[in-house]
A protein has these predicted regions:
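S-adenosylmethionine/decaboxylated-SAM
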Residues: 9-197
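Phosphate/oxyanion-binding active-site loops and adjacent basic polyanion-contact surfaces
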Residues: 4-8
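S-adenosyl-L-methionine
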Residues: 1
């Protein structure tokens, strides 16, 4: 059974369900999740898209390096969080279970790499319709990801950020206004921005 370690998956489902599609018959839908872990976020996104748009060519990209990486998870001034590199518990057995769980999802494309490796390896992908940012929680990393994906978005694209109170979301949202993104709703843990133009 596909599980998750976060909260507000109901909000994630609602934001996918109400994703604006500005074409009667879109030629393709492309979604992404950075930081897959056990996979519930990706499952919610794919289930909502396939239920809403059956028959439309669809691909969901899942990015996660797994492997118990040692890295700094949070900004230095994040209250209650370590400001030094720590080892995550993203084990190879967790990855194998996730791959097995998604074997029934033909639209699921797993990229076993970091966000930076993915962005460098796939500069021509897009446009993305929905991105769930649940990977690194440092402001500089979230900004880098956001700008990369914003350059590969279109009108109606939605970005959802998990654990947004752990980094400078105000800076991220401000930078995304350049691309036409506006905040449409904020929960306690997740926030959704939509490209309006």
């Amino acid at each position: 059974m596909i599980q998750g370690d976060g909260v507000e998956y109901d909000k994630l489902a609602e934001w996918v369900k109400t994703l604006p599609i500005y074409s009667e018959s879109p030629s393709q839908i492309l979604t992404c999740e950075i930081g897959v872990r056990e996979g519930l976020g990706s499952k919610v996104i794919m289930d909502e898209i396939t239920a809403r748009l059956p028959g439309v060519p669809y691909k969901h990209i899942a990015i996660d390096p797994y492997g118990d990486l040692l890295y700094q998870h949070y900004d230095k001034d994040t209250p209650g969080k370590p400001d030094f590199p720590v080892r995550g518990d993203y084990t190879d057995s967790m990855m194998k279970q996730m791959i097995h769980d998604f074997s029934r999802y033909p639209e699921f494309k797993f990229h076993n790499m970091t966000d930076t490796e993915f962005m460098n390896k796939h500069p021509d992908l897009g446009p993305f319709d929905f991105v769930h940012f649940d990977g690194p929680h440092m402001t500089k990393d979230v900004l880098t990801e956001s700008i990369w994906f914003a350059n590969r978005s279109r009108r109606g694209t939605r970005f959802v950020f998990d654990d947004y109170t752990y980094y400078s979301m105000d800076q991220v949202a401000y930078c995304l206004t350049y691309f036409g993104f506006k905040t449409i709703e904020a929960g306690e843990n997740k926030i959704c921005l939509e490209r309006k133009k």
